[in-house]
């Protein structure tokens, strides 16, 4: 949600920011028109309430003196009716303003590159050299099917398209990755692990910016609960509608969950393999912090995600996303892209974002300053995947494949896999 005071003072800057996010309509003008009408109605209501209070006092005095007061009573009734009518109009304008603001993305941070799509993203750094194969590397789905450990046909028969069955050692590899990642986040980086439901109320989805704009992208149950598209939804809402103390911050959560997405806008993209699925596992990081520390927290969070890839010895690059490629709630985002030799390209495996106060305004979460307890500021929220389990499995399969179709197991994972060193038939 946006700060209406900022829009009042900086309409041109807000308009420019929205255009950089791909919003072409004249948003600031529309917002200020609605805001003006709402404030005008609020002023009228305040004036009418003042008049009614004065008349009420006058009626009391007249009754005490046993003087006639019928005229004043009728006037009070008339004002009450007018207040009720204007209150309905004021609420309608408030709802209209919230609806417009709720559908607009966050304002990009000043150092975010301006651009329409991924072609304007900036590479920040790279890690690791690409492996030189003495054979033509295969894709993960070719490897998985030949090993008999990845079944797309049965998944499609039972569940439909964009689902995958992992068996045997590949299923075990997924479990090993979950355990490795969570232990690292908790033991090395001080995150608090959370196990949570996969279903949430619409309010929780609204608070993080998933609703109303992306309603069609999530799965809705018959009793109005939604399957989470990411643990970010639940973890961020753990602090919804609270006033915290600055000394409590930062708070850092981590969780593994199954995630569910319709992928409504992905028709024809990544139809083979398990790059883009309706259901996938992911380990998520969420940080709750202050305005002054949120930029540093984003750097820390990104480095945590990178550390996993370093321990897995997978080559990757870090990209600073441009304004048009960031997620709806983000003001600054790093994507980490892992090298996939089977595709001969880098693909996203993690996305770490600073959402600033955008989500906090929606869920009404603030903190009191240590120097001034009366001063309340909105918290800043951050989220990042560390990492997507399916895509990490893909990266291991393609980077650690052998000429005979077997897959070496990264050293850091072997203790989670009964000390196995290779995945084979």
Curated annotation (Swiss-Prot):
It comes from the Bacteria. The keyword Ligase applies. InterPro entries: aa-tRNA-synt_IIb, aa-tRNA-synth_II, aa-tRNA-synth_II/BPL/LPL, Ser-tRNA-ligase_type_1, Ser-tRNA-synth_1_N, SerRS_1_N_sf, SerRS_core, tRNA-bd_arm. GO terms for molecular function: ATP binding; serine-tRNA ligase activity. L-serine binds at residues 230-232, 284, 385. Coiled coil: none annotated. It catalyses: tRNA(Ser) + L-serine + ATP = L-seryl-tRNA(Ser) + AMP + diphosphate + H(+); tRNA(Sec) + L-serine + ATP = L-seryl-tRNA(Sec) + AMP + diphosphate + H(+). Transmembrane segments: none annotated. Keywords: Aminoacyl-tRNA synthetase, ATP-binding, Cytoplasm, Ligase, Nucleotide-binding, Protein biosynthesis. It is found in: Cytoplasm. GO terms for biological process: selenocysteine biosynthetic process; seryl-tRNA aminoacylation. Pfam families: Seryl_tRNA_N, tRNA-synt_2b. GO terms for cellular component: cytoplasm. SUPFAM superfamilies: Class II aaRS and biotin synthetases (SSF55681), tRNA-binding arm (SSF46589). Its EC number is 6.1.1.11. ATP binds at residues 261-263, 348-351. The keyword Transport does not apply. Consists of two distinct domains, a catalytic core and a N-terminal extension that is involved in tRNA binding. Belongs to the class-II aminoacyl-tRNA synthetase family. Type-1 seryl-tRNA synthetase subfamily. This is Serine--tRNA ligase. It comes from Wolbachia pipientis wMel. The lineage of its organism: Bacteria, Pseudomonadati, Pseudomonadota, Alphaproteobacteria, Rickettsiales.
């Amino acid at each position: 949600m946006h700060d209406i005071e900022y829009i009042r003072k900086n309409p041109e800057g807000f308009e420019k920011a929205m255009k950089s996010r791909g919003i072409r309509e004249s948003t600031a003008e529309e917002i200020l028109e609605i805001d003006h009408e709402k404030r005008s109605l609020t002023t009228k209501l305040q004036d009418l309430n003042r008049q009614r209070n004065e008349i009420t006092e006058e009626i009391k005095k007249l009754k005490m003196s046993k003087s006639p007061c019928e005229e004043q009573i009728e006037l009070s009734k008339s004002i009450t009716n007018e207040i009720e009518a204007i209150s309905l109009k004021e609420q309608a304008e408030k709802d209209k303003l919230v609806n417009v603001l709720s559908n607009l993305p966050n304002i990009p941070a000043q150092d975010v590159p301006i651009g329409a799509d991924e072609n304007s993203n900036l590479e920040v750094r790279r890690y690791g050299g690409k492996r030189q194969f003495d054979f033509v590397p295969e894709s993960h789905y070719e490897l998985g099917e030949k090993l008999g450990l990845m079944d797309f046909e049965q998944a499609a028969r039972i569940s439909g398209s964009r689902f995958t069955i992992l068996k045997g050692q590949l299923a075990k590899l997924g479990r090993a990755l979950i355990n490795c990642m969570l232990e690292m986040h908790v033991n090395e980086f001080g995150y608090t692990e959370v196990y949570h439901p996969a279903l949430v109320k619409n309010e929780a989805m609204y608070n993080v910016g998933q609703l109303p704009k992306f309603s069609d992208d999530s799965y809705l149950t018959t009793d109005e609960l939604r399957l989470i598209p990411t643990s970010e939804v639940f973890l961020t809402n753990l602090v919804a509608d609270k006033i915290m103390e600055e000394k409590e911050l930062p708070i850092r959560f981590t969780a593994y969950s199954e995630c569910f997405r319709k992928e409504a806008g992905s028709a024809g993209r990544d139809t083979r393999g398990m790059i883009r699925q309706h259901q996938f596992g992911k380990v998520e990081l969420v940080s709750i912090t202050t305005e002054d520390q949120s930029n540093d927290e984003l750097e820390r969070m990104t480095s945590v995600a990178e550390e996993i890839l370093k321990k897995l010895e997978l080559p990757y690059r870090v990209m600073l996303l441009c304004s048009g490629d960031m997620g709806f709630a983000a003001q600054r985002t790093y994507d980490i892209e892992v090298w996939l030799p089977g595709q001969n390209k880098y693909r996203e495996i993690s996305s770490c974002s600073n959402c600033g106060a955008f989500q906090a305004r929606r869920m009404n979460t603030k903190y009191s300053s240590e120097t001034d307890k009366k001063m309340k500021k909105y918290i800043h929220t951050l989220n990042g995947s560390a990492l997507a389990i399916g895509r990490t499995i893909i990266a291991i399969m393609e980077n650690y494949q052998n000429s005979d179709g077997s897959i070496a197991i990264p050293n850091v994972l072997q203790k989670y896999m009964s000390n196995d060193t290779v995945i084979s038939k």
